UniProtKB/Swiss-Prot annotation:
It is a single-pass type I membrane protein. The keyword Cell wall biogenesis/degradation does not apply. Keywords: Cell adhesion, Cell membrane, Disulfide bond, Glycoprotein, Immunoglobulin domain, Isopeptide bond, Lectin, Membrane, Phosphoprotein, Repeat, Signal, Transmembrane, Transmembrane helix. A motif (ITIM motif 1) lies at residues 760-765. A motif (ITIM motif 3) lies at residues 820-825. Most highly expressed siglec (sialic acid-binding immunoglobulin-like lectin) on B-cells that plays a role in various aspects of B-cell biology including differentiation, antigen presentation, and trafficking to bone marrow. Binds to alpha 2,6-linked sialic acid residues of surface molecules such as CD22 itself, CD45 and IgM in a cis configuration. Can also bind to ligands on other cells as an adhesion molecule in a trans configuration. This is B-cell receptor CD22. It comes from the Eukaryota. Residues 20-687 are extracellular. The gene is CD22. A motif (ITIM motif 4) lies at residues 840-845. Its main location: membrane.
Length: 847
């Protein structure tokens, strides 16, 4: 019982120390590798669930002291709550934190650092010891080369060089070498510093050849300066097919018929070992030849060819290089090959002499139709331009150093050419006229192959009644030449033969020579009778106008063309074959309006109130485009159409009218035409009434005139008395000048009105009665009182004389008329008169 007590206490303490291990979790590499002087990078993570880390101690080979319940060992690193680190711990760095990172770095690392590293972690309530193995060697340890399970030639593989070391403070590099020489291929280097693994790796992609079999591949570890540290080597095991080479006796593989030949197939390399051997000639396997040696005794020319051996292993078969075995012999009977046969005349032809021989023939003899061709000693005969006489049989004989061959049967050369000397022959008697039936034949001299058809170049409609014969019915005038061709594979054309067809003149037409522009009246005009062709060329001309013969010259001339020359012209041209007429050609003469006249409808006598139409008729080319109307005073009327319509017509419209027509050539005017408008019965009645009134007025005036005459005589008898009085009597005749009408103007015409006669105007001046004497009057008693039969008045009269022969609807050129003015002024002697205002009575009588 006493013995169990201490052990039970130890178990309890151990349990208390490790009872909470489930609360700590660590991740890091189990073992780290390094060498003397290098460094160690220890990636590490942890988890403490009860709080942050308060204390961390790195032990070297820690041991638990049961007496003190603590770990003893070399303390490489120790961190306290104040974070201070002793100076002797500078080569060890804690790169972690108080949460989860526990990464460490030891630089430099020494061999005596090998062993266990203990990470003593303490939080507020928990403790933990984590162990990591460290392996430090005296010298750098070598990397390890990893190869694929199998390597075959020409198949790409990846070589891997792995080193279980990596540290940030100590750079290294891995280099690949093949047989001590750096490899040309680029390697890919990668490093890993994770909690899972720490390493440096280099991968090289490589396509090995069979020659790499057994070669040494090295992965060399170097420091940053390229200094060698360590290496690893492997020997390549490259699987490949057998590598072969043929050796021949004799070495040049050239023998004559009957000689012996030995061929040996040497295997220079095979991995794995070869299993089968076979021989082939020109791709065909030789039976019962399964060894590396091939023996051929008494060879023949048929054994000439390409030989090679084929050896197989587990990787596959391999063929050797070919060996060409030449068995020499004299030329065999020759044959001739003709290139491009049958040959076309003018083309090139090449003959080839073919004869089996070894060595090849060095001399040839050629024959044409059994006759030797001088100077032809080559294998080929070339004729650049073949001719018909080259046709025939060609043969040859070949010769080499072993002998002369035999002449073969030869080859036939067929030279083809178009028909020769083709001609076109006219079968008709000459001359040939238009409309005749013509027969022609096509002839030739020779042809190869034979003529199979004919072609013709002819105008119009034709037929070929038999092969090589042409028949043309109703030959045309323009069928000038005809040619034929005889055809086999090609056509040969004969020279065109002229038919010389005679025909009447063609394309007769009238052509205006001058003027080049429009023809105006008075121009000089020339017309030409043209035709395109005539055979025979001797011709005669005839001119016609409206069916009337004019002349027999080729030209028709007009010195001064007139409108009467206009019309339809045609010309005729004839020769000994016939005559041809032109189409009618219209000669158009342009002239100004002429023969103008004014026609009146319904006539030149029209009653007033009716309608009258005046038409301006003319002859013009081109037609009148503009009309102008004038009256008898040459006054332009506002009418510009061909017809002047007066509706209703008035007496004042009576008079002479004329018109003027204008076209693009010029102007023309008509003579005067008079329109007479007479009164209607109603107007005549009114005029008669006015005339009677006028006669009555004249009668009254005559009576008054007699009275005035008597008074005047009385006045003359009392001249003495009048000398003392202030009365005066006088006549004034106002003679107005009338101008004669223009001789070129129209005559004053119209309806005469007899009531339009003389007119008399009267004026009476009356003096008031007075007794007051006037200054300057004679104071004679005789003159104090007027005569009893005298009246103190003044009579003033004007007699207007109408112009005889005038018409009332014709306005005179001048309004002044001839008039006789008569006045009488009488004032009696001084006497008393009653005071009264003087006045004037004025009377005008119009009729």
């Amino acid at each position: 019982m006493h013995l169990l007590g201490p052990w039970l206490l130890l178990l309890v303490l151990e349990y208390l120390a490790f009872c909470d291990s489930s609360k700590w979790a660590f991740e890091h590499p189990e073992t780290l590798y390094a060498w003397e002087g290098a460094c160690v990078w220890i990636p590490c993570t942890y988890r403490a669930l009860d709080g942050d880390l308060e204390s961390f101690i790195l032990f070297h080979n820690p041991e638990y002291n049961k007496n003190t319940s603590k770990f003893d060992g070399t303390r490489l690193y120790e961190s306290t709550k104040d974070g201070k680190v002793p100076s002797e711990q500078k080569r060890v760095q804690f790169l972690g934190d108080k949460k989860k990172n526990c990464t460490l770095s030891i630089h430099p690392v020494h061999v005596n650092d090998s062993g266990q590293l203990g990470l003593r972690m303490e939080s507020k309530t928990e403790k933990w010891m984590e162990r990591i193995h460290l392996n430090v060697s005296e010298r750098p340890f070598p990397p390890h080369i990893q190869l694929p399970p199998e390597i075959q030639e020409s198949q790409e593989v990846t070589l891997t060089c792995l080193l279980n070391f990596s540290c940030y403070g100590y750079p290294i590099q891995l280099q690949w070498l093949l047989e001590g020489v750096p490899m040309r291929q680029a390697a890919v280097t990668s490093t890993s510093l994770t909690i899972k693994s720490v390493f440096t790796r280099s991968e090289l992609k490589f396509s090995p050849q069979w020659s790499h079999h057994g070669k040494i591949v090295t992965c060399q570890l170097q420091d940053a300066d390229g200094k060698f540290l360590s290496n690893d080597t492997v020997q390549l095991n490259v699987k490949h097919t057998p590598k072969l080479e043929i050796k021949v006796t004799p070495s040049d593989a050239i023998v004559r018929e009957g000689d012996s030949v030995t061929m040996t197939c040497e295997v220079s390399s095979s991995n794995p070992m070869y299993t089968t051997v076979s021989w082939l000639k020109d791709g065909t396997s030789l039976k019962k030849q399964n060894t590396l040696t091939l023996n051929l005794s008494e060879v023949t020319k048929d054994q000439s060819g390409k030989y090679y051996c084929q050896v197989s292993n587990d990787v596959g078969p391999e063929r050797s290089a070919e060996v060409f075995l030449q068995v020499q012999y004299a030329p065999e009977p020759s044959t001739v090959q003709i290139l491009h046969s049958p040959a076309v005349e003018g083309s090139e032809v090449e003959f080839l002499c073919m004869s089996l021989a070894n060595p090849l023939p060095t001399n040839y003899t050629w024959y044409h139709n059994g006759k030797e061709m001088q100077g032809r000693t080559e294998e080929k005969v070339h004729i650049p331009k073949i001719l018909p006489w080259h046709a025939g049989t060609y043969s040859c004989v070949a010769e080499n150093i072993l002998g002369t061959g035999q002449r073969g049967p030869g080859a036939e050369l067929d030279v083809q050419y178009p028909p020769k000397k083709v001609t076109t022959v006219i079968q008709n008697p000459t001359p040939i006229r238009e409309g005749d039936t013509v027969t022609l034949s096509c002839n030739y001299n020779s042809s190869n192959p034979s003529v199979t058809r004919y072609e013709w170049k002819a105008h119009g409609t034709w037929e070929e009644p038999s092969l090589g014969v042409l028949k043309i019915q109703n030959i045309g005038w323009d069928n000038t030449t005809i040619a034929c061709a005889a055809c086999n594979n090609w056509c040969s054309w004969a020279s065109p033969v002229a038919l010389n067809v005679q025909y009447a003149p063609r394309d007769v037409r009238v052509r205006k020579i001058k003027p080049l522009s429009e023809i105006h009246s008075g121009n000089s005009v020339s017309l030409q009778c043209d035709f395109s062709s005539s055979h025979p060329k001797e011709v005669q001309f005839f001119w016609e106008k409206n069916g009337r013969l004019l002349g027999k010259e080729s030209q028709l001339n007009f010195d001064s063309i007139s409108p009467e020359d206009a019309g339809s012209y045609s010309c005729w041209v004839n020769n000994s074959i016939g005559q041809t007429a032109s189409k009618a050609w219209t000669l158009e003469v342009l002239y100004a309006p002429r023969r103008l006249r004014v026609s009146m409808s319904p006539g030149d006598q029209v009653m007033e109130g009716k309608s009258a139409t005046l038409t301006c008729e003319s002859d013009a080319n081109p037609p009148v485009s503009h009309y102008t109307w004038f009256d008898w005073n040459n006054q332009s009327l506002p009418y510009h159409s061909q017809k002047l319509r007066l509706e209703p017509v008035k007496v004042q419209h009576s008079g002479a009218y004329w018109c003027q027509g204008t076209n693009s050539v010029g102007k023309g005017r008509s003579p005067l035409s008079t329109l007479n408008v007479y009164y209607s019965p109603e107007t005549i009645g009114r005029r008669v009434a006015v005339g009677l009134g006028s006669c009555l007025a004249i009668l009254i005036l005559a009576i008054c005139g007699l009275k005035l005459q008597r008074r005047w005589k009385r006045t003359q008898s009392q001249q003495g008395l009048q000398e003392n009085s202030s009365g005066q009597s006088f006549f004034v005749r106002n003679k107005k000048v009338r101008r004669a009408p223009l001789s070129e103007g129209p005559h004053s015409l119209g309806c005469y009105n007899p009531m339009m006669e003389d007119g008399i105007s009267y004026t009476t001046l009356r003096f008031p009665e007075t007794n007051i004497p006037r200054t300057g009057d004679a104071e004679t008693s005789e003159m104090q009182s007027p005569p009893p039969d005298c009246d103190d008045t003044v009579t003033y009269s004007v007699l207007h004389k109408r112009q005889m022969g005038d018409y009332e609807n014709v306005i005179p050129d001048f309004s002044e008329d001839e008039g006789i003015h008569y006045s009488e002024l009488i004032q009696f002697g001084v006497g008393e008169r009653p005071q009264a205002q003087e006045n004037v009575d004025y009377v005008i009588l119009k009729h």
